[in-house]
């Protein structure tokens, strides 16, 4: 598993064919009421699916699942043996889809390239989706006997994944660090962390937790600030729930 191909769909949400999406849903969803409601919401969008809609995220993943299954189950080559028999061999070993980004991993450069071309063709012909032509074929990071890195890390989902460690993508790291440094200043003064800042800290914490960022977390008290941010959000949620309950009682 030394070779990877990475691509992404051009304007994925607006490009989704709603007619095909509905047909896919009709085949697999048997609840008529749920289908009716979902179709009404889909038809409320101007073109394709609406960017930012919570429903669109799920529908986009569902639509792209067809491409995932094609890549995971249909990408084979046939090898003919001397005795006349043929054998199907997988072109790739691993498939990863994350929203409109996808990654194919295999052992042979020619096989991974062929798999990528077949997947691009499938997505265009059967899903009406266009993969950006600048998709990348590269050798995955590996370490020689002297401990030197070669190839490229896998840059996906906000992480840069090396053979022996995982880093947070630089742009995300810098924004996350600013959020925690700012929240830390409020904590040092004994002040409550502003709600929007608390939400940002909670969102960024996942990247730091699931990467090799132990030094950063210790230096900037990330874990302690995260707990303070959680308590801040929890208190606010309780206030809203209590206010909502009072309004219901008043209405009754």
Task: Name each model feature, range by range.
Residues 125-129:
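Flexible helix-coil linker/hinge segments at domain or subdomain boundaries
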Residues 44, 69, 76-86, 110-120, ...:
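Right-hand nucleic-acid polymerase module
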Residues 1-99, 103-124, 134, 138-139, ...:
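Conserved polymerase palm-domain catalytic core
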């Amino acid at each position: 598993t030394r070779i990877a191909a990475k691509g992404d769909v051009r304007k994925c949400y607006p490009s989704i064919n709603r007619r095909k999406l509905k047909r896919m849903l009709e085949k697999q969803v048997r609840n008529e009421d749920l289908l009716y409601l979902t179709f009404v919401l889909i038809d409320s969008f101007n073109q394709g699916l609406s960017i930012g809609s919570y429903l669109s995220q799920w529908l986009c993943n569902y639509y792209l699942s067809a491409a995932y299954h094609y890549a995971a189950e249909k990408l084979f080559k046939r090898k003919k043996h001397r005795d006349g028999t043929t054998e199907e061999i997988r072109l790739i070993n691993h498939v990863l889809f994350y929203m409109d980004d996808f990654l194919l991993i295999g052992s042979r450069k020619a096989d991974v390239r062929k798999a990528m071309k077949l997947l691009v063709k499938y997505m265009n012909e059967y899903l009406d989706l266009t993969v950006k032509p600048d998709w990348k074929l590269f050798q995955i990071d590996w370490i020689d006997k002297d401990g030197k890195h070669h190839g490229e890390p896998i840059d996906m989902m906000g992480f840069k994944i090396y053979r022996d460690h995982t880093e947070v993508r630089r742009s995300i790291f810098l924004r996350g660090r600013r959020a925690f440094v700012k929240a830390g200043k409020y904590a040092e003064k004994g002040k409550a962390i502003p709600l929007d800042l608390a939400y940002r800290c909670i969102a960024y914490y996942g990247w730091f937790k699931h990467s090799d960022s132990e030094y950063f977390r210790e230096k900037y008290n990330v874990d302690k600030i995260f707990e303070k941010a959680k308590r801040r959000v929890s208190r606010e949620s309780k206030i809203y729930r209590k206010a909502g309950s009072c309004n219901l009682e008043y209405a009754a």
